[in-house]
Amino acid sequence: MKNYLSALKYCYENGDFVKSRAGNVKKAFGYQMRFDLEKGFPAVTTKKLAWKAVVSELLWFLEGSNDERRLAEILYEDDRENLEDKKTIWTQNAKADYWKNKSNFKGDVGKIYGVQWRDFNGVDQIKNLIKGLKESPDSRRHILTAWNPAELDEMSLPPCHAFSQFYLSNNKLSCQLYQRSCDMFLGVPFNIASYSILIHIIAKECGYDVGEFIHSLGDFHIYEEHFEQVKIQLTRDPKKLPAVSYTHLRAHETS
């Protein structure tokens, strides 16, 4: 994960200090990281990664759900006692004051990632993506997007990781993600892991090997409250990348 630490260092040392909507930040614009998934899974090793939260959210997206309480069911699958009191990374959005008048039910987060992936104006993008990769592997149209301008006002949070393209070469599946807004300390390690898992899932479903995850950052930033933690991060040496093992993965129902 040296390339992640390099991006973090660049932002911390070269970013502009500004007051943003969500707090003071150091921010920069435009950066690309590449992760060769054949060489290991790009999990950050210089701090803890919320692995179960990463996997649970991705599965929730793939279900096409807009129910934050459904995410809680997945996340706390082994401990559902007092589930109503347990939080997820989307709880704050579901309960936000600005969202209350738009929410249709308790836990509603609106037409966010999963809804767009599985029902973008009636289009199941995940199903189409897999079908396209199987039937027309050399196509330049293997696109997955959560950015639906017509429905941004119906989302509790507009998509940060907005647009991705999949690419096949030598039987290896790669993905490039464009992320418009990038929280370098908390969000980006989470996003790297999530899309790398997604590549594994889709590659497995299509019968391909994994290639690269390419992460293109738009507005990438470090919040002032994380400055001290970032400085600690930058003193640590990353460990050897872990490997991912699984017995069975499915990206969608084929029936």
What are these regions (language model features)?
Residues T247-T254:
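Conserved small/polar residues in nucleotide/adenosyl-binding loops
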Residues L217-Q229:
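Short, conserved secondary-structure transition motifs
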Residues L173, I199-F220:
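Glycine-rich phosphate/pyrophosphate-binding loops
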Residues E38-R69:
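Glycine/small-residue-rich interface belts in oligomeric ring/scaffold proteins
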Residues M1-G23:
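Short, Gly/Pro- and small/polar-rich lid/capping loops
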Residues L234, P238-Y246:
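A glycine-rich helix N-cap at a beta->alpha junction
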Residues E63-I197, E205-C206, R250:
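A contiguous catalytic/ligand-binding core that recognizes phosphate-bearing ligands
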Residues V18-A43:
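An N-terminal structural lobe/cap that precedes and organizes the functional/catalytic core
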